[in-house]
């Protein structure tokens, strides 16, 4: 038996690749990933061990993982009382005694982004508490934060229900087929690849059936299904994501071996990276005479920072010919491998939701939605809601033209039965009845009408304001410029605006006019668009207005950098500097009934400010440092008294004053902090 990669050994043992990785770690066998090699001797030993005992070990492993959770639920602790002030992630974490970083990491592993110190809702607090088996009670007085059910979008409630279902039913999760989007530069072979896979892998249609465009199709590889979205490119991908309807699990980035990494390749990569979707690179056209796979790999490294696995990285790169089918089977196997490692799952018997790929008015069927089922089993006769539109499923038709009675997770179908045309890329939910569907739709329409003039704006000022709520802040930018030189100079200049408190994330940068793709990426990523010597085309301008994306264009780079620098400086926490204002001495201590002790003070130098602070020294030792409660000059309340005048002072929470005590007065000044741009950068531009 020769040496094997981890995933190859997992296949032989009929084990999950991730499970085998874990087992190898437990055995002290060092492997980095599923692509790591295991030597021949170790392979033989593992085969001897696991071929006989794998089933028993799995049973024991399951028993071990279930037992602690049972004990955990049985050991109930007293509830933690939560007030309005506790509804910040850092304070809430401290209150429930779970490290904030752990909460952020655990939610990130579930695909949810939390930021340090962010404000959290009561429902999110409950969700976090449930994850760690912490019981909560909430403040119920008039100052407590109360959710406003009348203003809440019912679609948000449906979304939360799915989050809770996933949280509370982890034991019911099962693997589902991955949904794949193919991206890449124009003419690099995206459509050719999709067509080849469809022709060679999709089962023959029913006799008399007509191939139906449902926006996606399924193939079977080694007995497992893969769903491909049939519209190549990143435009639909990002439009769906901007509307919260993420359907893609894996991105295949197609790069031509004779052309290398091109502008749209970079653009597509940035879209996928922004969505945190795993990427497999297919280097296409290797059958051409001028194909250069190594050059293409080098450009993947230098332009995209994607290091192929055979070069020591962790990016799966498969050289293929979509026209001739060379290595396409290997690509499909790699998709299944990544799907296994990503642990793509669903709850098949949960309530139903689906993601709309596209909608249209069909001559025969009326308003239809091409969709992919995400959870549950969609059935003919179900009542469905998609945004502000509802309907009853009259027919489900797959990509082979076959009518289905039901559609399982990851199945692409055309849904017939909507009363009106749903918004493209909306999420479809199944509800109990027509009455419930109508209730939801009416509420959504009412909310949309009310909020029509209050549409969310992704503006620099608003993003920076929201950033104040977090400890580590991030400003996302999309940069467009007229030339490569201008773009590089701009990137270098912005890189100098770095600070430990604010990260600048350049989501995407490219040469050329601002287009619709830029707008949708900005909307999905909550980024602003900065253009240097370029403008937005008409379509992009209209889309930016409807999406609430702010575009700022400049012809002078100094102005762009000054605006960005000023905005970032406004977000920096000011530096607190102590400034001494004066000195005095207590000449007399007066005790006033029901009020406390008042110090009769002679000012020797400078002044005392009522809003400032004081240090009291006795025989050279500090006995008090704090605030001034009241300041009087001849019975009059004043804000300031200067030397050589006398005054009466009451110190906040301190009455142990004595004649002869020396006083040092000071104020705290908040000095705005500055960012520094290296001057030579300006000269280069």
Swiss-Prot record:
HAMAP family with a match to the protein in the record: IF_2_B (MF_00100_B)
Domain of life here? Bacteria
Q: What is the lineage of its organism?
A: Bacteria, Thermotogati, Thermotogota, Thermotogae, Thermotogales
Q: What is this protein called?
A: Translation initiation factor IF-2
SUPFAM superfamilies from the UniProt entry: Initiation factor IF2/eIF5b, domain 3, P-loop containing nucleoside triphosphate hydrolases, Translation proteins
In this chain, the stretch annotated as G4 covers 284-287
What keywords are assigned to this protein? Cytoplasm, GTP-binding, Initiation factor, Nucleotide-binding, Protein biosynthesis
Q: Which gene encodes it?
A: infB
**Primary role:** One of the essential components for the initiation of protein synthesis. Protects formylmethionyl-tRNA from spontaneous hydrolysis and promotes its binding to the 30S ribosomal subunits. Also involved in the hydrolysis of GTP during the formation of the 70S ribosomal complex.
Q: What Gene Ontology cellular component terms go with this record?
A: cytosol
| Organism of derivation | Fervidobacterium nodosum (strain ATCC 35602 / DSM 5306 / Rt17-B1)
Q: Enumerate the residue ranges of region (G3).
A: 230-233
Keyword Transferase listed? The answer is: no
* Basic and acidic residues composition bias: residue spans: 64-79
**Entries under InterPro entries matching the protein:** EF-G-like_DII, IF2_II, IF2_N, P-loop_NTPase, Small_GTP-bd, T_Tr_GTP-bd_dom, TF_IF2_bacterial-like, TIF_IF2
Molecular functions (GO terms): GTP binding; GTPase activity; translation initiation factor activity
